[in-house]
Amino acid sequence: MRGDAGLPAPRAPLPIEAVIAALAAAVLHAVWNALVKGGGDPLMDLALVWGGSAAVALVCLPFVAVPVAAAWPYLLATLFIHMPYGLLLAAAYRAGSLSHVYTVARGSPPMLIALATAALGETLAPGQYLGIAVISAGILATGFAPHAPARATLLALCVALTIAAYSVLDGLGARASGEPIGYAIWFFVLMGGCFMAIVSAWRGPAALALYARTNWRRAAVGGPAGALGYGLVLWAMSFAPVAGVSALRETSVAVAAFIGWAFMGDPMSKRRIAGALLGLAGAEAVKPARPLHRQIAQQR
């Protein structure tokens, strides 16, 4: 079976390398989101974090090739989607807590991604689809707050739609490029530059520069975390099912819930603990039984 544009469609089980990469990316993703939420101005802080990622990528740019022509439609499309994603995410963090916004935004996409990638010809084992559904349920149980501001919930759901869209595009683009790390580096240079230009035009370059002088540590920590995490996910998606990788990455809500509880005063209820454990149980169902090198050996 082949996916979009004649690309091979990875099948279950997920390689262990992809699992490790996705789980590491989950921790890194929760960290940079906590930095954005924990600052004084989520929009400015997100610009600094993504600008920091762009700076890291810019240093690496001379050592990677320009993405092939087949990858550029996906690269430009995901770049376009990341602009409203960033603006919506910053607005959501202004309206609600880290635990609630992050959970709703990251808990909703996995099943949407699974359905979208199935339509493109990428399939998982039935138990893995069940695992993705369990992850989504656990994520939503971890942080969904029925009495949270309606604006925060609505914005988080809009963020979720952009996440589902760019995740599918990321997987297709990484495979089309043949060089997922190079693809990620080019993406971060363009994305960070574009988003900082938007924020600079909106708030003014002097205001952004002043904010950066007093909050540069967020860029120094969050920038590399974001770039490395995204690169790991793209690398994993280049040879493993997009739906499975995305679902495992969303277990980051357990990390975000802990950060919100430990450092931001978010409550840690029994429901959230049970939801986190449910999400981890779903992750176990998505995980593989064989490492990648054994799968390759059996295909030869």
PLM features per residue range, with description:
Residues G51-A57, M111-T117, L124-F144, R271-R290:
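Hydrophobic transmembrane alpha-helices of multi-pass small-molecule transport proteins
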Residues L228, L232-R294:
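C-terminal appended segment following the main domain
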Residues A26-A30, L79, M83-L87, G107-A114, ...:
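Hydrophobic/small/kink-forming positions within alpha-helical transmembrane segments
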Residues G52-V56, V104-A118, A133, L190-C194, ...:
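Alpha-helical transmembrane segments of compact multi-pass small-molecule transporters, enriched
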Residues G40-D45, L88-A105, G121-T123, R175-G182, ...:
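Structural motif at transmembrane-helix junctions in multi-pass transporters
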Residues A22, L46-A47, L75, Y102-T103, ...:
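Hydrophobic/aromatic positions within or immediately flanking transmembrane alpha-helices
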Residues R2-F80, G86-G96, A137, F144-L157, ...:
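Membrane-interface interhelical linkers
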Residues A57-P67, I113-G127, I163-E179, A225-V242, ...:
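Hydrophobic alpha-helical transmembrane segments in multi-pass integral membrane proteins
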